[in-house]
Amino acid sequence: MSTEPEASAQPLPAQQSAALFRLMTWLSPAFPVGAFSYSSGIEWAVEAGDVEGAASLRDWLDAMLQHGAGFCDAVLLCYAYRATERHDDASLLAVAELAAAFVTSAERQLETLSQGRAFIEIARKAWNSDGLGRAVAACGEAIAYPVAVGVVSASHGVSLPATLHGFLHAVTSNWISAGARLIPLGQTDSQRVLAALEPAVIATGSRALAASLDDLGTATFRADLASLRHETQYTRLFRS
């Protein structure tokens, strides 16, 4: 075995390495946006018996990704990213206001706005830039989580496709984490669910990149109802 480095093993360019480092940091479970305290209605779905194990959790999340909040948030992220990249303050404000309103319940609004606010605050303290400050100001007071991720990534030159797929992976992982604590599921079963959802994450990201705001909408009535009913659920671990 040779101890000499292979010529084909070239390092990533510095700019790509920095972008990857930042994206992995921002979308890591360790990034303090409080995602662990939200279940997006999954807690009620478990209580009601709609989600009982790994298979039903996978099916529930597949629908949320492709036909529910996952797809809608992905589209909103894309529009926020592009508006930031173009320095189009009017469009950025419009998409920020739409994202803050385009939620199915008061708890879902709390979830997305709280995480968005935390994401912006930490990102600005650790990776601030003049462009980021300008974009944040253009968004107005309410910044939903997907808008926050799009704005920060665009301001730092992280590519939109990478940002989008990283965001969907992070959201899906958090949903699975909530389900694992509630059902409960073991670590191996949780990873099997995540692996099974890989095609849905990829497909949702691809659709969102090509979607218009007219494509926003959900076909996940039961999941939307779960988010509403969670507001009056008697015993709860999660805020949504």
From Swiss-Prot:
Sample GO molecular function, one term: nickel cation binding
Keywords: Chaperone, Cytoplasm, Nickel insertion
Subcellular location: Cytoplasm
Alphabetized Pfam families for the sequence: UreF
A cellular-component GO term for this protein: cytoplasm
Subunit structure comment from the entry: UreD, UreF and UreG form a complex that acts as a GTP-hydrolysis-dependent molecular chaperone, activating the urease apoprotein by helping to assemble the nickel containing metallocenter of UreC. The UreE protein probably delivers the nickel.
Family from the record: Belongs to the UreF family.
PANTHER family in the record: UREASE ACCESSORY PROTEIN F
Protein's UniProt name: Urease accessory protein UreF
Source species taxonomy: Bacteria, Pseudomonadati, Pseudomonadota, Alphaproteobacteria, Hyphomicrobiales
Gene symbol of the encoding locus: ureF
